[in-house]
Amino acid sequence: MMEKGIWKDALIQSTKKLSPKLQVKNPVMLLVYVGAILATSLYFLGFFGISDEKSGYTLAIALILWFTVLFANFAEAIAEGRGRAQADSLKMARKDVLARKLKHIDDKTDVIEVASNDLKKDDIVYVLANEQIPMDGEVIEGAASVDESAITGESAPVIRESGGDRSAVTGGTTLVSDWLVIRVTAVSGESFLDKMIAMVEGASRKKTPNEIALQILLVTLSIIFLAVSATLLPFTEFASKQAGSGSAISITNVIALLVCLAPTTIGALLSSIGIAGMSRLNQANVLAMSGRAIEAAGDVDVLLLDKTGTITLGNRKASEFIPVDGVTEQELADAAQLSSIADETAEGRSIVVLAKERFDIRGRDFAEMHAEFVPFTATTRMSGIDYQENTIRKGAADAVRTYVTANGGTYPQECDAIVSKVAGAGGTPLVVVRNNKVLGVIYLKDIVKNGVKERFLDLRKMGIKTIMITGDNPMTAAAIAAEAGVDDFLAEATPEAKLELIREYQREGHLVAMTGDGTNDAPALAQADVAVAMNTGTQAAKEAGNMVDLDSSPTKLIDIVRIGKQLLMTRGALTTFSVANDLAKYFAIIPVLFYGIFPQLEALNLMGLTSPTSAILSAIIYNALIIIFLIPLSLKGVKYREMPAGKLLSRNMLIYGLGGLVAPFIAIKLIDMLLTVLGIV
């Protein structure tokens, strides 16, 4: 249930939206708006004896038309109100605070206190525990726990640190521990929080291409019905004279008939469907930079999914040291630990822990060793340490083979056998080499998440192809892909390989979605049709994507696709229902309206409507009430089911197409009976 305040605010907003400036934005409802004004004018003209229109009947038509416009405004106001309520909670996190601006990055005592709104890009700020981060930025020094609950709703603090893919921080979040030095990446008004508020309020929402195309269709239909209705006045006048019976249709009835036949149902709900779709995405803690991105998600037929965190649990754990002949397990463990000391990944830490547990290998004096750590990069796919004329590297088998060969060493065939065995079991092998001599393999164990196979099966039913992206060798990738049930995989993936894979599928006419969090993902994110950047990721990744997942959960991509498809389905279902409604109302009203001139048409009055007046009133009352009844469906969305597109279309055509034809006949007859019983007609 929505809060009482949202309903109250929506009622107020629906009256404010009666302004002509706002009504012009919806051409279909503008037709009803103008009709209401004309009917009201005719009532007053009849009241003062200037017109022959029946004053009581004309007043009833005018009031119903005004309520139709108000109901359409109410649908849009409710959708906007839900977004506004979410925006209000975000605004509480956005407040001007004093920031410590560093004059020199090396001197944390020499600071200038400035208001956060006055900070500029590339300013360096120093933030301590229990202080609010003043503006969006990149951590350039330090590591700390950050409370991001104001934005994500997740109460557990997250780690933010310099380097790597967890360096981005958001203004309005709070430091829980330690300290950070941050380089500002956005100015006031352009921050991530500002963009979120603008999106959920709908201030920056633009109509999507599909919405524009549908609105053009609805306007075209409305113009056709307007032309048809306009000709009824001279036609019925001529026909009544020729037939010698009946009378010309009144202007009030022409207005009412036009409103009944125009696609007012979908015209009234179209805006609220789009806003509600954006709101559902926001409730899933995903910020879309445009409505176009949500629609693209609904049309996606290829998903590129990172193995780690999406398909597997994410934290691979070192489970075994497997040395080659002539090398002891302890010797391999010692070298593996040294190469992983500076590795802050979960895998790196697990290697250090396993070496401690197995052989009690403890910390070293790296200053005395004159050690220099070599970080992992996507290009080399290795990390390690250089110390006292010793060089240790660990990494993917093919990367280590290239490294050893390039330096004049020999890569043993025995190592290939170990790598194949580990990969065949679904593990990840990391080869360790010291001074160009291969020592053995670290066995990292991957665990596939529960339930992913079933989810991929559902996606396959929907006609979506799933591709696992991993840096693992082909054998490991194949084993995990088979266990998880994905359609294909890309092994030993580099940024260039991801980019080329996306382009290849796009050339074949597919729409591609992917997730990413690192700077190296930025080119592929920029190329993908739906690009979901992780909130924990780098600024470059966020700027390249067209969506940001505040929870930084790679599995969210599947939910985003479902929300996108639900949006398109809801719009299609209600459009089908609206058009079917118009057809039914046409066959319900026209025979009754004209059987005074053409008595033969009485045979087509299948519902036995009492009179033309009753038929018009019943139809126009139904036309207004159906908008109110469909508001919950437009906000919640049509329930999405994992089934082939053809079956889904047939199902929805049966429910909303046939339902749209039957509902008006039943409802109009019931309203007609009620009006007759009450003596209104």
From Swiss-Prot:
CDD domains: P-type_ATPase_K. It comes from the Bacteria. PROSITE patterns: ATPASE_E1_E2. Belongs to the cation transport ATPase (P-type) (TC 3.A.3) family. Type IA subfamily. The gene is kdpB. GO terms for cellular component: plasma membrane. Mg(2+) binds at residues 517, 521. The system is composed of three essential subunits: KdpA, KdpB and KdpC. InterPro entries: ATPase_P-typ_cyto_dom_N (IPR023299), ATPase_P-typ_P_site (IPR018303), ATPase_P-typ_TM_dom_sf (IPR023298), ATPase_P-typ_transduc_dom_A_sf (IPR008250), HAD-like_sf (IPR036412), HAD_sf (IPR023214), P-type_ATPase_bsu_IA (IPR006391), P_typ_ATPase (IPR001757). It catalyses: K(+)(out) + ATP + H2O = K(+)(in) + ADP + phosphate + H(+). ATP binds at residues 343, 347, 376-383, 394. Its main location: membrane. Keywords: ATP-binding, Cell membrane, Ion transport, Magnesium, Membrane, Metal-binding, Nucleotide-binding, Phosphoprotein, Potassium, Potassium transport, Translocase, Transmembrane, Transmembrane helix, Transport. The active site is at 306 (4-aspartylphosphate intermediate). The chain crosses the membrane at residues 30-50, 59-79, 216-236, 255-275, 587-607, 615-635, 661-681. NCBIfam families: ATPase_P-type (TIGR01494), kdpB (TIGR01497). The keyword Metal-binding applies. It is found in: Cell membrane. This is Potassium-transporting ATPase ATP-binding subunit. It comes from Listeria welshimeri serovar 6b (strain ATCC 35897 / DSM 20650 / CCUG 15529 / CIP 8149 / NCTC 11857 / SLCC 5334 / V8). The keyword Transport applies. Part of the high-affinity ATP-driven potassium transport (or Kdp) system, which catalyzes the hydrolysis of ATP coupled with the electrogenic transport of potassium into the cytoplasm. This subunit is responsible for energy coupling to the transport system and for the release of the potassium ions to the cytoplasm. One of its GO terms (molecular function) is ATP hydrolysis activity. It is a multi-pass membrane protein. Its EC number is 7.2.2.6.
